[in-house]
């Protein structure tokens, strides 16, 4: 199962007794704050959950898998998520389904 933003908003509606519009706005606002902070070049640290960090990747040689031709892969900035200790511990305790 994958949790979506809509499902998060529905859970907030139920747990916090918000109306659907307020819950959806809260979820959108939360993620927009993360997006804006990363776009401004800053990392995001969510205590007890994890960190969203920006990393600069250097340009490197690449290869077209269909033709085998060498092509350059340009330098770029990527977002990396590093789970926090509490999140890792909780996930490790959960039982795999199957």
UniProtKB/Swiss-Prot annotation:
GO terms for molecular function: DNA binding; structural constituent of chromatin. It comes from Actinobacillus succinogenes (strain ATCC 55618 / DSM 22257 / CCUG 43843 / 130Z). SMART domains: BHL. SUPFAM superfamilies: IHF-like DNA-binding proteins. This is Integration host factor subunit alpha. It comes from the Bacteria. InterPro entries: Hist_DNA-bd (IPR000119), Histone-like_DNA-bd_CS (IPR020816), IHF-like_DNA-bd_dom_sf (IPR010992), IHF_alpha (IPR005684). One of its GO terms (cellular component) is cytosol. Belongs to the bacterial histone-like protein family. GO terms for biological process: DNA recombination; positive regulation of metabolic process; regulation of DNA-templated transcription; regulation of translation. This protein is one of the two subunits of integration host factor, a specific DNA-binding protein that functions in genetic recombination as well as in transcriptional and translational control. It holds the Pfam family Bac_DNA_binding. Keywords: DNA recombination, DNA-binding, Transcription, Transcription regulation, Translation regulation. Heterodimer of an alpha and a beta chain. Residues 54-74 are annotated as: Disordered.
